[in-house]
Regions:
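Mid-sequence acidic-hydrophobic segments that form the walls
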Residues: 106, 134, 138
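Short acidic-glycine loop/turn motifs at beta-strand connectors
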Residues: 101-104
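Compact, glycine/acidic-enriched structural inserts
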Residues: 116-135
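A surface-exposed partner-binding patch
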Residues: 1-98, 139-140
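Short aromatic-glycine-(Arg/Gly/Cys) micro-motifs in beta-strand/loop hairpins
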Residues: 107-112
Length: 141
């Protein structure tokens, strides 16, 4: 995970500036999960242990934190309730929510598609590493 964060930090075009937050502790992650009654996937916990949220590439991507006082905390729905409650929202990229669907153990870029057709209609990633790889690839190509 740290390698990907360093790769993002090294992309330094003017509009591509990225800001990373201080790491979250395991106890902060556990407390958030308990309080919010959510289960954060392990690959996103690995990110949180490196950076408790981030703004990537001038705001093209926002990765949510476990800081309960942040507006952009995990499960923040900027669409005002249009994301199915079954999806765990961990951020957004361009116009899509970055979500985790426990049914499939996968991450998706979700933009108001039919929840029952999410696998057919949305970009799917097996873990959060793949999400970051995709975002990095788009940024550098």
């Amino acid at each position: 995970m740290q390698e990907r964060i360093e790769q993002i930090k090294n992309i330094v075009e003017n509009w591509m500036h990225s800001d990373f937050h201080s790491p979250a502790t395991d106890s902060e992650i556990s407390e958030f999960e308990e309080k919010m009654k959510v289960k954060i996937p392990e690959s996103y916990k690995e990110f949180l242990r490196c950076s408790n949220g981030a703004e990537l590439f001038g705001g093209d991507a926002i990765l949510f934190s476990v800081n309960a006082s942040d507006k952009c905390k995990i499960n923040y729905d900027f669409s005002e309730g249009k994301v199915p409650k079954e999806l765990l929202i961990i951020g957004f990229y361009n116009s899509c929510h970055i979500c985790y669907d426990a049914r499939y153990g996968s991450f998706f870029f979700y933009e108001y598609e039919d929840y029952d057709s999410i696998k057919e209609e949305c970009l799917e990633f097996s873990d959060f590493y793949e999400v970051l790889d995709y975002i990095i690839d788009i940024a550098i190509n």
